[in-house]
């Protein structure tokens, strides 16, 4: 089952005639994703990598039945592109674009809440979503992911890749990996995605990768403590980050003593998550702990018999 995307997902790429849009549309298509349309105003009637281009998302949806949008529109116009996708009936919007003004994203979030409360936005400033072997909607290198039972949710693109590579190396595949993005105002949160994984029968364990800034990891910890009965592993980047200095992502900043890696790690440990302190040990730690859990379950089963 996985979450968010699968082999039936039909993708429209907004900004497909640009350099990044055309390159990644081709990569997604080659992975096996149904990339059914592209959109660039004024370029309707063209084809990019055999994908028909339309002037509007509405037109693309009408002609192809697209239900997911992948956005590569420049930052000044990206908020309008998200709104256009929502207005066209798109259920899942994945926005890769970095550098969208905070006020633009606040407008988008407000617009979604009022008009499309059931629609889902991943990003912006994210690597996208991949369900290994079924669909890739984003910019991640597909070959490092393997079908399996661990759900990944992360604020960092490159740490997502590192974690997936390590898990795959230890024979642990992924159900779905979701890069939620590193901007301060964005769509789906850690908590949202963990809730989806918790309800997904194909996901048996969850790996969350957070970083300094904001309180989303703490909010996820509250949900984990109350609702999640699957093993949750967590890595928080930025242990040595100084207060007030932005660390890579726009949202990765400690302000007013809040958003520290230490506070997030403590909240997650209290919630029962397995907190990993070294990013090089993610795969090894997950593999070891899952093996212990498996052995404990086998012992309980044999005792019951």
Swiss-Prot record:
This is Succinate--CoA ligase [ADP-forming] subunit alpha. SUPFAM superfamilies: NAD(P)-binding Rossmann-fold domains, Succinyl-CoA synthetase domains. Belongs to the succinate/malate CoA ligase alpha subunit family. PANTHER family: SUCCINATE--COA LIGASE [ADP_GDP-FORMING] SUBUNIT ALPHA, MITOCHONDRIAL, SUCCINYL-COA LIGASE SUBUNIT ALPHA. Heterotetramer of two alpha and two beta subunits. It comes from Aquifex aeolicus (strain VF5). The lineage of its organism: Bacteria, Pseudomonadati, Aquificota, Aquificia, Aquificales. Coiled coil: none annotated. One of its GO terms (molecular function) is nucleotide binding. The active site is at residue 249.
């Amino acid at each position: 089952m996985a979450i968010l995307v699968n082999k039936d997902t039909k993708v429209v790429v907004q900004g497909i005639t640009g350099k990044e849009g055309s390159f990644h549309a081709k990569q997604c298509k080659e992975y096996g994703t149904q990339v059914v349309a592209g959109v660039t105003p004024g370029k309707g009637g063209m084809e990019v990598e055999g994908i028909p281009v339309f002037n509007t998302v509405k037109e693309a949806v009408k002609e192809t039945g697209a239900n997911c949008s992948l956005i590569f529109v420049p930052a000044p116009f990206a908020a309008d592109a998200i709104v256009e996708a929502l207005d066209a009936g798109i259920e899942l919007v994945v926005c890769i674009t970095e550098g969208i003004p905070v006020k633009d994203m606040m407008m988008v979030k407000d617009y979604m809440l009022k008009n499309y409360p059931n629609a889902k936005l991943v990003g912006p400033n994210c690597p996208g979503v991949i369900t290994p072997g079924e669909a890739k909607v984003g910019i991640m290198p597909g070959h490092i992911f393997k079908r399996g039972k661990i759900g990944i949710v992360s604020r960092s693109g490159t740490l997502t890749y590192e974690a997936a590579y390590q898990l795959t190396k230890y024979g642990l595949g992924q159900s779905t990996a979701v890069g939620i993005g590193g901007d301060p105002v964005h769509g789906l949160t850690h908590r949202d995605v963990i809730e989806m994984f918790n309800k997904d029968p194909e996901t048996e364990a969850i790996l969350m990768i957070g970083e300094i800034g904001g309180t989303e990891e703490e909010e996820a910890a509250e949900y984990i403590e109350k609702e999640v009965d699957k093993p949750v592993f967590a890595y928080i980047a930025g242990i040595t980050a100084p207060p007030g200095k932005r660390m890579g992502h726009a949202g990765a900043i400690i302000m007013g003593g809040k958003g520290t890696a230490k506070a997030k790690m403590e909240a997650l440990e209290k919630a029962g998550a397995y907190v990993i302190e070294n990013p090089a040990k993610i795969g090894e730690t997950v593999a070891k702990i899952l093996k212990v859990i498996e052995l404990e379950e086998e012992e309980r089963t044999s005792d019951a018999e």
